[in-house]
Amino acid sequence: MKKFLKYVLRPHWKLIIIILILSGFQTYFQLEIIDLFNSALNCVKQENMDLILNIGETMLVYTMLSMICMLIISVIATNVSANCAYETRRNIFHILMNLPSEEVGKFKITGLMSRTARGVYTEQGFIEMLLKNVLLIPFVITGITILILFIHIHFALIFVAANALIFIILFFKMKKVVELYFKAKKTYGRINSLFLERITEVKNNIKHSNKEDFKDACDDSYDKNIKYQLNQYYIAPILFLILDGIILILMAMISLGYSICIDTVNIVDSVVIIQYLVYFVTTLTFVPKLIYKFPKAYATSVRIEEVLVLEDKIDTKIKNKKINFKKFEFKNRKSRNSRKISNIDRRETRKKFGLLLSNYRFKFIFSFILLTISTLCIVYAPKVVGNIVNLFTNGNNVVEHEVIFTNILLLAILYIAGYLLQAYSNRIMIFIAEKITYNLRIQMYDKLKNSKIINEKSESNILSRINNDLVNVRDFIMVHASEIFAQLLSITLVLILIWTTDWRLSIIYFIAVPIYAICFYHFDANSKKSYEVHQELLGNLMGFKRDCLENHELIRLKNQQENVESDFKTINFEIKNKYTSSRYHSGLMSPLATFLTNLRNIIVYICGIYLLMNGEIQLGTLLTIIIYGKLLTTPIKKLTASLTSVQTSYSSVKRVFEVIENYDEE
């Protein structure tokens, strides 16, 4: 992967430096907002409301600057990832069209097709995540460590140690997961080859004879994918459990300090440290998706490198230069110019997909029950943290110490139970998704004979539905369905608990959530059409490339490399444009979410400090409200990211059902 990333990102090093600089500024502005809140808290004893309002104005300025940084990073990252994908597809095609036929013959056609379409698409998404999210983490860790170091050196060391532990777990665990994914990935090649044979048989009215082989290939793929998934589904919950464990250690340190009369961490400082930790956790919302995508991106990069390293073997000699050939044409050329998206009714598609999922409704219900309990545990935890802080500020008698340690124990139980139940819910969804994928593969294979699509689309366009679209459907069931449920549930529960904590401050959140929804719906509607067209174009690209590979020797004989590369460039450019146009809309969601979140937090800070100054609420209550605000931000950000996957998944579901349901009656 290192070679591939170096190959595709080197031409964009100047833009990457800009992203790094902006990531540093973004982190500074976000942490400065929290630091300003600390300054505002210290003004409570002085009862200087004018100074607090001035601090609020400064926070607003930093919020605007942070949003601008995020927006620029999003635009640059989208352009860089789109250009990397465009150049990679172009280079792969150029190499293959100019390689000697014996070199091309060493690869399976289906494998070369998938590298250009789904393979490059996978790398594109990974590169975008790398630029937008991963590059931000070193700045956040460094910034928080330095700020905590000024407050308490021992706790700064604990924070660094926890991050080192997370890195070690990721490094060694992901190494094994990648190896298992390579084994699972190999099974896709056999499935694609057998499915392509089936398409050819149906198109040419040849008697079908390979169903058992196809079923065996699906069985093998199911077994290896289950083994791969079971080795990585629990990694993200464990990492977040470690991060939340840092809060437990902080509470224990403060409690210990009060018990033995040692000034460990000032209560106000501890509130600020908790906010730093909560902000750090919110920046890691992408980690589960990164863990899921990394093995795919790693394996795909290796497969792409296998083609790119063949550039030295390109045969540049022009054959038959004196012969005047007409321009080479393909029988399936018309398929690539198709722009019309299937008119299958959206409601009907959702209904069919719902019926498919209903066969596993009891497992779904059980999984969602576990997820509900898990969410309840995690969402209730901030209330316990607030109670502990209130107990610290109430006095130092023995009874309160016992209650404090009881609350710390309760907090530990909530975190452990919450993340363990979340992991087991993920395990159930893995089996459901893999089984549905297995059944859909068999159905597509069986019903292909009578499908109308067999005469309407190219062979490779049909193949992309089992190679690309079915994988998207599986990912939606396995990851995004439960994610969306958990996110919506978290938002609902957080709003309820905020209301029960303090109804006055909760009004701010109840006003903010509909604004989030309206903005995100607008961006979602604008990006939907581009996603559907993008998926259709990927299918057409696979069809065009298959035509070229099957006629590779003839293309070279007639010196048509430049002509087919020109046609490929046209399709490739359209794919790039559709990707960037859809990502520009969805890419605005995260900066907008951050802006609205910071604006909401500033209002909560000012109003909360005013109530604290007048003795109407306690410090622990304000901290609980603030943590709930961060906890509300996390599912909202995840929900915005999930919208992208929902659009891709929805268009993929339509394309799968076009094969299964759109058939001629015998």
Sequence positions of predicted segments:
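Primarily ABC-family ATPase nucleotide-binding module
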Residues: L308-R346, I660-E666
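Transmembrane helix-loop-helix hairpins at lipid-water interfaces of multipass membrane proteins
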Residues: W13-I72, I76, L149-A156, D263-I267, ...
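Cytosolic ends of transmembrane helices, especially the final helix of ABC transmembrane type-1 domains
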Residues: N210, Y234, F280-V307, I430, ...
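An intracellular "coupling" helix at the cytosolic face of ABC transporter transmembrane type-1 domains
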Residues: W13, S101-E102, R118-I127, L131, ...
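A hydrophobic transmembrane-helix motif
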Residues: E32-N38, L65-M70, L131-M174, L230-V278, ...
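Juxtamembrane helix-loop junctions of ABC transporter transmembrane domains
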Residues: F29-N38, N42, Y62-G105, I109, ...
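Short, membrane-interfacial amphipathic segments enriched in basic
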Residues: M1-K2, E102, K106, R333-K351, ...
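Primarily residues marking transmembrane-helix entry/exit sites
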Residues: H12-I17, I52, G56, I72, ...
